[in-house]
């Protein structure tokens, strides 16, 4: 578990600037609590938003996993 709102912003600003002219695909898969922040920081960039711990189940009590429908709301 790594990340904090302030360090996420600094890291993503450097990443987005660093890949602006790169002929490659880049994705960032932050922990679930930071998806909203990271989605906002990546908006309009060529960096794709991904996610961690996608559950194979559509719903239910699966601690630590995230439902696909929940991730879709963030554009993952």
Predicted regions and their residues:
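Non-catalytic positions within long, well-ordered alpha-helices that form the structural scaffold/packing
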Residues: 64, 72-75
């Amino acid at each position: 578990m790594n990340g904090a709102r302030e360090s996420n912003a600094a890291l993503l600003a450097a990443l987005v600037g660093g890949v602006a002219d790169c002929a490659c695909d880049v994705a960032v898969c932050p922990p679930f609590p930071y998806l909203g922040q990271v989605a906002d920081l990546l908006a309009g960039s060529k960096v794709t938003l991904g996610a961690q711990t996608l559950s194979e189940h559509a719903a239910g009590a699966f601690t630590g996993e995230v439902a696909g429908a929940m991730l879709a709301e963030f554009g993952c």
